Amino acid sequence: MLARSSQTLLAPTPAYSPAIPAADWATAAATPSLTKSGALQAEEIATYLASAPGRAILVDNTSDISLARQYPTFLKKGISVVTPNKKGFSDDLSLWKDIFASAAEGKALVYHESTVGAGLPVLSTLKDLVATGDEVTRIEGVFSGTLSFLFNTFAPASGSSDAQWSAVVAQAKELGYTEPDPRDDLNGMDVARKLTILARIAGLEVTSPDSFPIESLIPAELASLPSSADGITQFMTRLPEFDAQMANVKDTAEQQGKVVRYVGSIDVAAKAVKVGLQYFDKDSAIAGLKGSDNIISFYTKRYGANPL
């Protein structure tokens, strides 16, 4: 199957035979019996994939919530899903339940390890802890490489930095650490989505990522600027007006012998999830991160005071 917004090219079904050679796609695209006008709907794609001679896998490399909401459609037909798209697993709790119920119904698999921690085995480790009977009491960490870079540069644990907050944000944007619109990092929602996924695996029924406190680093006066190229330029131009606010946060931490970091935490016993700024001793693991490194700690009954 080869698709674009105006046309979809399909190999014959149900046997997918004869297959269309890759080099002949242009010729095949001119054959009415092999094409369909416009893009296929999720149900049509699922039906097509389900007719494959072997097991089919949907690999979703988008961050599209509308596609993620269609995962149950594929899973019920026995089509496994592999994706880094965290939106489907951090959206409304009903979708989370529907995804895994549909996977069980269709005897399909769901792999979303890279929704948290990129390539690190974060979710599989947490699932193994839960599956082997350990009791997770708390999860804490720095979950955003972008925000890690910002605070490690702005308020390093060793040495000092005179850099203004807006200059560090501009540097991160220039280096490609931030999204095209840095507000997509500074609003904390990406971290909140990751915390939602972890909390659900740990056993908490978090309804959605906006159901718990999220501390945004976007000045209120700039939050309503449009997401257009002009709006992004306005945001970056005006951000220096608010450098004093972040300098005060850094100075307050320094007066206590600490540094400020942007972290997420889950208190399983208290059923509390939060995302925002916290102060840490300079010799702590979180304070000692370098560059854009992340750190995630699992506190469990089995591991006691020493987190995994």
Model feature map: region roles:
Residues 303-308:
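C-terminal catalytic subdomain
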Residues 105-107, 111-175, 185-191, 197:
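Rossmann-like NAD(P)H-binding beta-loop-alpha module
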Residues 11-17, 71, 93-96, 121-127, ...:
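Short acidic, glycine/serine/threonine-rich loops at helix termini
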